[in-house]
């Protein structure tokens, strides 16, 4: 039986950059408030490479291993949101990933 894959878009950057040099917490808090105020479901997930465990998706663990430093990934099914984050944060990596699970 062939697995169904879901396409997600993501940004990746060093944990230090996103938590110390950029106001990531503030950006995501404002975006979350916007989603709630507009009755939209929150469709992004944050993965910290230093906190992955046995329950983390294998594709995410494999992706995190491609970076040589503690990394944060923000994953969403909404490509426009990821593009907005890229424009807002600038010095980050973006791409897409196919996951066999639905986040």
UniProtKB/Swiss-Prot annotation:
Q: Which family does it belong to?
A: Belongs to the ycf54 family.
Keywords noted in UniProt = Chloroplast, Plastid
Domain of life assignment: Eukaryota
| Record carries keyword Plastid | yes
Where does it primarily localize? plastid
Q: Which PANTHER family match?
A: PTHR35319, YCF54
Which locations, inside or outside the cell, does it occupy?
Plastid, Chloroplast
Q: Which InterPro entries match?
A: Ycf54, Ycf54-like_sf
Official protein name in the record: Uncharacterized protein ycf54
For this record, the Gene Ontology CC terms, alphabetical, are: chloroplast
Q: Which Gene3D superfamilies match?
A: Uncharacterised protein family Ycf54
- A Pfam family annotated for this chain is Ycf54
């Amino acid at each position: 039986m062939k697995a169904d894959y879901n396409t997600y878009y993501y940004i990746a950057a060093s944990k230090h950059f996103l938590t110390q040099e950029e106001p990531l917490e503030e950006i995501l808090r404002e975006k979350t408030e916007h989603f709630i105020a507009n009755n939209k479901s929150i469709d992004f997930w944050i993965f910290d490479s230093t906190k992955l465990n046995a329950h983390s998706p294998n594709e995410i663990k494999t992706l995190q291993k491609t970076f040589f430093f503690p990394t944060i990934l923000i994953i969403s099914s909404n490509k426009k949101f990821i593009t907005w984050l890229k424009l807002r944060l600038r010095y980050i990596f973006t791409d897409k990933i196919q996951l066999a699970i639905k986040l």
